[in-house]
C-alpha cells in the first residue's frame, strides 16, 4: 500500500472529465493506504465540472459523490487549525506573493495535506513550488 494522500480538485476534475492523464491519477488513488479530500474540494470540483462539462452543479456533485464512495475517499471538515494553516500558506505561497500563486482552494488543500501529514495528489505546476509533500 502507498502513502496517505489528500486529493486536490485538479485530480477529481481530471478523472471525472476523462482527461488524458486520468488513468495515472486513478492508479495513485487506488494504491494509496488512505484517501482524503475536503468539503471545499467538493464545492470547487462541482463548480469546475459544471462549467467544463456544461452540466448542473448538482449533477457534477453527484458524480463527485459517487466517485468518493467508489474509491473510498474520506471527506474531512475544515476546522480552525486547518484554516489557520491555510492563512499561513497564503502568506507564504499565495497569488501575488509567490511563484506558486495558490488560490483560496489551493491554500486549503495544502493546509489539509499538511494537517494530516498526507501527500498531496494534484495536477499542475503550482504545488511543486511549495514545501508540501506531493505524489
Outline where the language-model segments fall.
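Anion (oxyanion) recognition and catalysis
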Residues: 29, 69, 114
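Acidic, PIN/NYN-like endoribonuclease modules and their adjacent C-terminal/linker elements
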Residues: 2-4, 110-135
Amino acid at each position: 500500500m502507498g502513502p496517505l494522500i489528500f486529493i486536490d480538485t485538479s485530480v477529481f476534475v481530471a478523472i471525472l472529465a476523462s482527461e488524458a492523464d486520468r488513468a495515472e491519477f486513478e492508479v495513485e488513488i487506488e494504491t494509496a493506504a488512505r484517501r482524503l479530500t475536503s468539503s471545499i474540494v467538493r464545492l470547487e470540483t462541482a463548480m469546475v465540472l459544471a462549467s467544463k462539462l456544461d452540466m448542473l452543479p448538482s449533477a457534477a456533485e453527484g458524480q463527485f459523490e459517487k466517485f468518493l464512495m467508489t474509491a473510498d475517499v474520506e471527506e474531512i471538515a475544515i476546522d480552525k487549525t486547518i484554516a489557520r494553516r491555510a492563512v499561513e500558506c497564503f502568506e507564504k505561497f499565495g497569488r501575488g506573493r509567490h511563484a506558486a500563486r495558490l488560490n483560496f482552494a489551493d491554500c486549503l488543500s495544502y493546509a489539509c495535506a499538511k494537517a494530516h501529514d498526507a501527500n498531496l495528489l494534484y495536477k499542475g505546476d503550482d504545488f511543486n513550488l511549495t514545501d508540501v509533500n506531493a505524489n
